[in-house]
């Protein structure tokens, strides 16, 4: 019995070309054919599927609200949790160093692998099969799309706060450390004319920027940072 049969059962798709699934599970640290190209494709396919569902289920929502709702459905945390729920982490192929450093628990690796699998299913069986699988993974969250509230992320709220007061837009300075497959992003956020400077650190640039923006908001007098998320948008 193929060791990937159990995973394919969880995914809801039996691959015609099993090599596609194997590549989707292979991280760039392994030194073999890896999942980066499939991840690139899967990111777009996943975004389209969720955007299409939102468009149909939220006919009154504006473009900006639709964008924020889509981002909340496909952000790194959401995808990493779904990847773990499907048991994808059990089948990942990593390099020795990445394996020892806990790569099978790394949020970015889990999210990337899920996107790569979306790309692999799309190539293997087409859009409709891919759509069926993706919507099944999301489960009840798909039914909740009609009730989903479009929350703004920290960077958007900070920009709106500054624009309302005719202040300059924030500057985000980024420093990258670590190997290519295990990078850490340190982002400093500041605004010309204001005394504050905040820092955000994460394994993705966008999330580090959100953390820095949220911390900056929390320093402002009216407490705009309360209750917002550091969503990876």
From Swiss-Prot:
Subcellular location(s) of the protein: Cytoplasm
Gene Ontology cellular component terms for the protein in this record: cytosol
Segments forming domain DRBM: 153-222
EC number: 3.1.26.3
InterPro entries, per the entry: dsRBD_dom (IPR014720), RNase_III (IPR011907), RNase_III_dom (IPR000999), RNase_III_sf (IPR036389)
Nuclease recorded as keyword: yes
Entries under Pfam families matching the protein: dsrm (PF00035), Ribonucleas_3_3 (PF14622)
Subunit structure: Homodimer.
Stated name of the protein: Ribonuclease 3
Organism: Coxiella burnetii (strain RSA 493 / Nine Mile phase I)
């Amino acid at each position: 019995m193929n060791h990937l049969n159990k995973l394919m059962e969880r995914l809801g798709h039996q691959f015609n070309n099993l090599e596609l699934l194997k590549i989707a599970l292979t991280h760039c640290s392994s030194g073999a054919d890896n999942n980066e190209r499939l991840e690139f494709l899967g990111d777009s396919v996943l975004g389209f599927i969720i955007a299409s569902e939102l468009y149909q289920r939220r006919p009154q929502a504006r473009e900006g609200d639709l964008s924020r709702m889509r981002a909340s459905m496909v952000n790194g945390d959401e995808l990493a949790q779904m990847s773990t729920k499907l048991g994808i982490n059990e089948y990942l192929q990593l390099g020795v160093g990445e394996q020892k450093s806990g790569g099978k628990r790394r949020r970015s690796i889990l999210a990337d692998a899920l996107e790569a699998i979306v790309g692999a299913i799309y190539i293997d069986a087409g859009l409709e099969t891919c759509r069926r699988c993706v919507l099944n993974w999301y489960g009840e969250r798909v039914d909740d799309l009609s009730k989903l509230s479009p929350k703004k992320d920290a960077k958007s709220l900070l920009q709106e706060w500054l624009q309302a007061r005719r202040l300059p837009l924030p500057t985000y300075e980024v420093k990258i450390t670590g190997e290519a497959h295990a990078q850490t992003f340190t982002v400093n956020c500041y605004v010309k004319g204001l005394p504050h400077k905040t820092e955000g650190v994460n394994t993705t640039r966008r999330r580090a920027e959100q953390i820095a923006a949220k911390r900056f908001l929390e320093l402002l007098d009216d407490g705009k940072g309360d209750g917002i998320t550091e969503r990876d948008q």
